[in-house]
Amino acid sequence: MKKVFIIFSLISFSLGSTINIPNDFPTIQLGIDAANNGDTVIVAQGIYYENITIDKEIFLSSYAIFDNLENGWINNENIQSTIIHAVSDTLNPSFGSCLVVRDGNIAPTILGFTFMGGIGTVMIENDNCAIPINRPERSGGAILIFKAYPTINFNRFINNGISNENERGRKVSKAGGAIAHYDDAEVEFDEDRNRLININHSIRDIPEQLNIQNNYFENNTSSDGKNFYSRGYEGSIDVSHSIFDDIDCESNSVNNFVLKSRDDYAEFIQNEITGNCIDGNALYVSVDGDNNNSGSEDYPVKTIGHAFSLVKDDTTITTT
């Protein structure tokens, strides 16, 4: 199945041009800017300190696209060594995601990267109140998706959703520590407020399913939707064969703090996911704890947010 997907993807984009990073352009963003719909941007191993935007239909991949990913893909050298690390001190402080995929109902493919250090991008939620309230909130620590429907496979999402602990005024992703997806007219980018913008509104039909299979999630942080947050999308989101920090091994699933669909519009498909098995009894949280602990009374975890990701229906959380 995995080989078939990669071959199909390559055929789909084979009529376009191929741009190689860093041979053709020194940064991924410059390569994307030069690409046209249907082109492929292939990235060599290295650490790329960038905040990237995709607003066109392209295939973005590491050299993992040429590898056999049928078994043991998590140890693939190209995936582990092709890193997109967000930059938090850019000229636009609202933009803190590793990657933003936006507008036009585009459906690019992102394959074979490690995403790290993303703190999310500021979105404005327009409340339908008697007195309108525009609330800015960071979303999509590693990847923020807005009115787009990408395929995201064979990637690692590690340590996204919160800024460095030594940074003054730490920034935390409100929704989607790893990935956030918005398909909602009541949400807009902070930078788009109060200005007219020329956006390509595609007539493409919205797909019934998002393909987010075969990804690895570790130590991402968010107030809601630790690894994936969806708002407005009414289809299914397939995260099958992915690897999470912790799962309920009895139901082979994670809870709705880890994978969150606001108002339960979307359904998460979780076939054959893996992770550490969680205990459904009681969890203890302490300021002196460690999130690598089991959450027992003798070995408490450190943060309530991490405790939420360990919760089963019959779990009690105790703070000390």
Predicted regions, residues:
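Right-handed parallel beta-helix/beta-spiral solenoid domain characteristic of secreted/periplasmic
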Residues: 23, 58-125
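Short aromatic-glycine-(Arg/Gly/Cys) micro-motifs in beta-strand/loop hairpins
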Residues: 16-18, 271-292
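Acidic glycine-/aspartate-rich tracts in secreted/extracellular proteins
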Residues: 39, 46-47, 63-69, 115-121, ...
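Surface-exposed loop/turn motifs in large extracellular/passenger domains
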Residues: 37-40, 67-69, 91-114, 135, ...
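Short glycine/acidic-rich loop motifs that flank beta-strands on beta-rich extracellular proteins
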Residues: 48-54, 70-71, 87-97, 119-126, ...
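Short consensus segments that form the blades of beta-propeller domains
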Residues: 131-135, 168-171, 201-202
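Acidic Gly/Asp/Thr-rich repetitive segments characteristic of extracellular carbohydrate-active
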Residues: 17-49, 287-320
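Sec-dependent N-terminal signal peptides
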Residues: 3-16
